Design a protein with these regions (language model features):
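A structured binding-face within diverse protein domains that lines the active/interaction site
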Residues: 1-99
Length: 99
């Protein structure tokens, strides 16, 4: 397991999309986290504050949003954690113990 934080210590914003659609008498909500290619794996599209504002603004032009999808990934600080973080009985600072 890894603990990921922004390289510059700011807040992480993840891009997502959602839709509400009716089925009979119930409205279903659906969400999806948007990803971008990152080496050989995929990771969420992480936005800075300006990217977050553009992503949430319904007036943002499509080409600007496409630019966010193609942007360089925001650097993250990666720390390997001990496996105790996988124990559902534990829910405290000890879960952030380095490996």
């Amino acid at each position: 397991p890894y603990w990921l934080t922004p390289g510059e210590g700011s807040t992480l914003f993840f891009a997502a999309i959602w839709e509400a659609y009716p089925v009979q008498e119930q409205v279903w909500l659906s969400t999806a986290v948007v990803t971008q290619a990152a080496q050989s794996q995929r990771r969420p599209l992480i936005l800075d504050a300006a990217g977050q504002a553009a992503w949430l603004d319904p007036e943002t032009p499509l080409h600007v949003l496409q630019g966010l999808l193609a942007s360089e990934p925001i650097p993250l600080r990666e720390r390997v954690l001990a496996n105790m973080v996988n124990d559902p009985k534990l829910n405290g600072p000890e879960c952030l113990t380095p490996a």
